[in-house]
Amino acid sequence: MSEVRAAVITISSSLARGEGEDESGPALVAFAERVGARVVDHETVPDERELIEGRLRYWSDHGGCELVLTTGGTGLSPDDVTPEATRAAIDREAPGIAEAMRAASREHTDKWMLSRGVAGTRGRTLIVNFPGNPPSIEQAGAAIAHALPHALALLARDDAGHRHD
């Protein structure tokens, strides 16, 4: 896999206000690096749909990233709006990615079905919502790590099969 640029977004209103310490973002940065991506930025945004959607669009359209990973905001709480923001930003869903992540979580928690994370593409960028805690990030990441290089290689090709590096 040629170099893949990635952005990691931690989604948490409290962390965006400077309350507490982000443990999930660094765990997701480490995952991205393990799968061969170069993380160009890790930012924190509050649980606000328009802000999340705007950052997803920015990193896909102008930030030069082939991979955007989010952590947080995927549960059932009223302020968990990451899936809605992601659906608004993507062109196509990649449901198998989110399904594999949920299936992996099933082995570790009886609350796996409460995750609403989605994955999809915007142009040539893959966007994936991860859960909001380090152990779940590890479990979900292990479920999809082997498929990410192929997915990213497919997105890098044009209709004639040529790479866009």
Language model features with spans:
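Non-catalytic beta/alpha edge segments that cap or flank active sites
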Residues: 1-165
